[in-house]
């Protein structure tokens, strides 16, 4: 009996080291090899699990406290995960008691803040639990140089992107940034997205926001995401706008710790 695999390799197989995407899987007859088929099913299960994984805002709040930061635990108007998935509109608004809590905070502390940071589970609590604190570490160490005042960080359960608009408006913030779990993909169940808005208020559309996507070690690094976000924030303050009228033209010079990067595979480098 031959030890030779019945699977036929793909000539592009060397490219797989450059991407987690499903390329050059080979074939077994007219179908996929068994290993590739099982890996696909496993990745699909991971993506489904990421959507339904419970959010743990208290753990994030503890992490913020260890960093000397305040965290407010809030909930959207979606009462549970099933409602959240079926009624996106409810995930965009806070529960009335949570909105009242933010109004009271604003009345007690007076005046607005330059920046309100929101962390929400979105469609992948896994992404938030893995990447929110490391990303905040990179971002917050750069903020003092800008001289911006910071509102308490809001931790929102069952939140959608637009919930940051209401939070920013209630806190009187000039800018909002929401860190939220993106819809899981088959090679990325834990991608974190950042959405930035200048002059937030209820009723804004996606055209008023800037998005930085796929923040995770296997995608856009924390340092590069913070670098791009700070550029957008500076330009927004200067031009007093955000969204489609504000383009990401940040310098992309290599950051410390970014590594040497892959070479040109066509030339046999890297």
Curated annotation (Swiss-Prot):
Signal peptide: none annotated. Pathway: Amine and polyamine degradation; ethanolamine degradation. Keywords: Bacterial microcompartment, Cobalamin, Cobalt, Lyase. It is an enzyme of class 4 (lyase). Its cofactor is adenosylcob(III)alamin. It comes from the Bacteria. The keyword Lyase applies. The keyword Lyase applies. One of its GO terms (biological process) is amino acid metabolic process. Its EC number is 4.3.1.7. Binds between the large and small subunits. GO terms for molecular function: cobalamin binding; ethanolamine ammonia-lyase activity. It catalyses: ethanolamine = acetaldehyde + NH4(+). It is found in: Bacterial microcompartment. GO terms for cellular component: ethanolamine ammonia-lyase complex; ethanolamine degradation polyhedral organelle. The basic unit is a heterodimer which dimerizes to form tetramers. The heterotetramers trimerize; 6 large subunits form a core ring with 6 small subunits projecting outwards. Belongs to the EutC family. This is Ethanolamine ammonia-lyase small subunit. It comes from Azotobacter vinelandii (strain DJ / ATCC BAA-1303). The lineage of its organism: Bacteria, Pseudomonadati, Pseudomonadota, Gammaproteobacteria, Pseudomonadales. The gene is eutC.
